[in-house]
Amino acid sequence: MINPTTITNYDRNQRELEEFLMFCIMVAGKSAKQTAQKLNLFLSKRENNESPLEYVDALLHEELGINLEQAMRNVRLGQYGRLKKAFAGILRFQGHLHEVSVEDLESINGIGPKTARFYLLHSRQNVRHAVLDTHILKWLKLHGENAPKSTPTGKKYAMLEQAFLTYAWKYEMNPADLDLHIWKQYSQK
């Protein structure tokens, strides 16, 4: 099960990477703790020691007497259309999640810059990205950056990402540690 307070783990195996990527997709705009619990409940229905993506694939092909959307509704995951498209899309990375890039992930319907960077930042060592969620944006604004309230795109994302990485360097922290530190600080409020 995903533990949001210790999200960074560079030693995940393939099954753990599958679960973590599903969590990254699901958590957008939701409570991390609640999302982790719902994902755990969803995956607890697996049979025969299936990996998370093997389970999704079986549900998509209705091999278990239930389809993916029904299984998601049974545990109230929400955002059914978006999650179904994203989960189906990530099947192409099965067995290769150690190698995917931001661009690979962003090519999936339902995965944007924030989700792609979140996955990579907290699953691979020495990755230099910023997850510009509301917590990071508030923190950047507090530090004098012209940060909007919601996640920007394009050049604005790139500019704020660089600002965040500069602060990480200044504070002698890797970006994943600074991200988690800020998230813990702001998510408690």
Predicted features and spans:
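Alpha-helical ds-nucleic-acid-binding substructure associated with the helix-hairpin-helix region
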Residues: L39-N109
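Structure-specific DNA junction-binding interface
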Residues: M1-E69
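Generic structural signal for hydrophobic core residues of well-folded globular domains
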Residues: I25, G29-K30, F42, R46, ...
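C-terminal accessory module of base-excision DNA glycosylases/AP lyases that mediates lesion recognition
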Residues: M1-R15, E19, Y80-L91, H98-V100, ...
